[in-house]
Amino acid sequence: PLQVTHVQYSRGGGNVAPRRPLFLCLHGWGSNEADLADMMRYVAPYNDFASLRAPLVLQEAGSGEFGFGQGAYSWFHDCVPSGEDLDRDAYAAAQAIDDWVARNVPEDRAVVPIGFSQGGLLAIHLLRVHPERYTASISLSGFLAPGIVAGSAPADSHVAELNIPVFYGYGKNDTVIPMPELFATAAWLDEHTFLTSKSYRGVDHAVSLNEFSDLRDWLAAHDIAPGIL
């Protein structure tokens, strides 16, 4: 089974504001744990975070096809898998993340996954595996596993009862995730969660300052992170 072994925490080992929710940062394909850690100072600078490195290695730290840096990693065996392969990859990665949370985060600490692309799918899939553990979820340019492999999304039958707040944002010019898949993800979330969905004109497979602004407002409205003046 997959296992999360590398984590970057916010200051103080992710324990400076223990009464506020801990953000669980999940990067996209070909990135690493530093990616979303940098983003958090714009989104929720007064909350703690734990940014997890995906366990599948595309390139170790140094120079290579992904440039020079801290390395490139993936949660799945392909950039954008589909069908049964995506179900299996999503379940394996979500289980690895959920296991890490169980081992490393006190049970009474609220946890909010925030992910981009592959990580955005997993921020949703954690709700399809163990929804009771997660206070809310944020999917940025994420997509959805189809749920055709039996047991790969075991909580689908009851997650809607929990009415978990979810923020879902994507660019209207996304060329990585097909637009019908983004629409289908939003539709599934609307049916199964307490959804706020936003789309951004002129934005590709990326995040934007407008999205950060909307996300900050949403976090404040749901009392997840204090508003920023």
Enumerate the predicted regions with their spans:
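Serine-hydrolase catalytic machinery in alpha/beta-hydrolase-like enzymes
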Residues: L2-E107
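Acidic catalytic loop of the alpha/beta-hydrolase fold
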Residues: P146, K172-I177, H205-A206
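C-terminal catalytic histidine-bearing segment of alpha/beta-hydrolase fold enzymes
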Residues: P180-L229
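Short beta-strand/loop motif that positions the catalytic acidic residue
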Residues: L162, Y168-Y170, D174
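Alpha/beta-hydrolase fold nucleophile elbow
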Residues: P106-G115
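Gly/Ala-rich beta-loop-alpha elbow adjacent to hydrolase catalytic centers
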Residues: G115-G119, A123
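Conserved alpha/beta-hydrolase "nucleophile elbow" surrounding the catalytic nucleophile
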Residues: H27-W29, I114-F116, G171
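A conserved short beta-strand
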Residues: E132-L144
